[in-house]
Each structure stands twice: as C-alpha cells, then as structure tokens.
Amino acid sequence: MTTQLSVNVNKIAVLRNSRGGTDPDVLQAARTCIAAGAHGITVHPRPDQRHIRAGDVLALSALTREHAVEFNIEGNPFAPPRAGYPGLLELCRATRPEQITLVPDGDGQLTSDHGFDFAQDTTQLAELIAAFKAVGSRVSLFVDAGNPDIAGAAALGADRVELYTGPYAHAHASGQTDTALALFADAGRRASAAGLGINAGHDLSQANLGDFLAAVPGVLEVSIGHALIGEALYQGLEATVRAYVDILRGSQVGA
C-alpha cells in the first residue's frame, strides 16, 4: 500500500488573507492538488482565523466529497468558540470529515510544535475524542516521537497518531539523521503494537520524505503544506504534488 498524501492548504489562505479578497483561491489550489494525485486535503482552522476560515472548511468539505478524496481537519479541541470561529467540534459536525487530527496548540503559537502530554490531558481528552468519533470521523492525535506513552492514545480512543516530524526535519537538514530516525522508527513500532495507525507531518519535504519513509515502517499518511507550497513557487503546484506522489509510490507501507 502507498502512503497517502494529504496536502495542507493553509499557506494558500495565508497569502490570500495578507491582501484581502479571494486570491489566491484556496478551492482552486485544492482542485489542482487533487487533479495532480493528492489523496486528500488538510486544513487547520485556528480561532484567530489567520489562514483557513470557517467558510473555507465548508467549501473544501464539499469539494473533497465531490472528488472522493479524504478531508482532514486539524485543530485544538480545547479552544473555545469565538466570533467567526464556531469551535472545532461544531466545524466537524457540520462537515463530517474522514479524519480529525487533534493538536494541542495555543492561540499564540506560530505553528504546531509539540504533541499531547497524555499524563496531563487524559480525562478531558478522552471525552473529546468520543465526541469527535460520534461525528463519524477517524480521530488522530498529534504526538512527539519521544512520548513514552504513545500507546496511551489508543487507551483514550484514538484511531491513529500523527508523529510530529519537525525534529526529524531539523536533524535531516543538519546531516545528522541516524538518531532521529531511530527515535521515529521506535515510535512507529510502539504505535503499531498498540493498534494505532501512523500518520506523520510537519516540515516534511521532497528532500527528507523518502529517507523518513524508508526508516519508519507503516506510515499511512503524510500531511504536507509549508514545504510543498514553498517548493511550488519554483516548480509549480501541479508538478510539486506529482513529485511527492512519486516519492510515496517509491516507498511502500511496510516495505
């Protein structure tokens, strides 16, 4: 089985919002990604609406259903609703995405940079996971590879974990990947042993994705946005998505 590519289109919305109006068009970008072979689309609507907004979520939900690809909504389940942001659970109830990825990021964070601490978040998180699964969606939890209790995600009711790959990307850029890859491979094995599916994301790129998949068995999905959109500035969006799909086809799950 080939690892699936879900393209995160947040950065398209960042560029649109920086000027106002509707250009570049998030929906058109998503269509291009799907036509080029992306298996899904990811968004991370934040309460401050810095990029993806509630209206985008609704429109992208319809688009992904039309094209029979998966829709993955990321977000902080603890963030309360506010003006323009109905809350993650309400957005998911309105769209029923194939996957909901829960991420413990605060309002002031530039980007997601750590996973859940199951020692602190358990009771409320278990209740929230049950509520999200009642929507009919698969639930994935954002976790650090070094988390000693990755299996705890299964006990809380999650279906998958998404390994936060930022530390691996930094290690790869510095030419020191062995220790990082060993850590992620171990995390993958522990997740699989607990019956959890494995996703991965954050700072994955054409330069480092192949090495990661070769070392970490069983990755079902990668969510890639920042690097992909940056590369697309030089290579074109369609060509960039096709390049990622080619990398994934060369790295079979479980190989």
Curated annotation (Swiss-Prot):
The keyword Phosphoprotein does not apply. The record marks E162 as: Transition state stabilizer. GO terms for cellular component: cytosol. Catalyzes the complicated ring closure reaction between the two acyclic compounds 1-deoxy-D-xylulose-5-phosphate (DXP) and 3-amino-2-oxopropyl phosphate (1-amino-acetone-3-phosphate or AAP) to form pyridoxine 5'-phosphate (PNP) and inorganic phosphate. It comes from Xanthomonas oryzae pv. oryzae (strain KACC10331 / KXO85). GO terms for biological process: pyridoxine biosynthetic process. This is Pyridoxine 5'-phosphate synthase. The active site is at H44 (proton acceptor), E74 (proton acceptor), H202 (proton donor). Pfam families: PdxJ (PF03740). Its EC number is 2.6.99.2. SUPFAM superfamilies: Pyridoxine 5'-phosphate synthase (SSF63892).
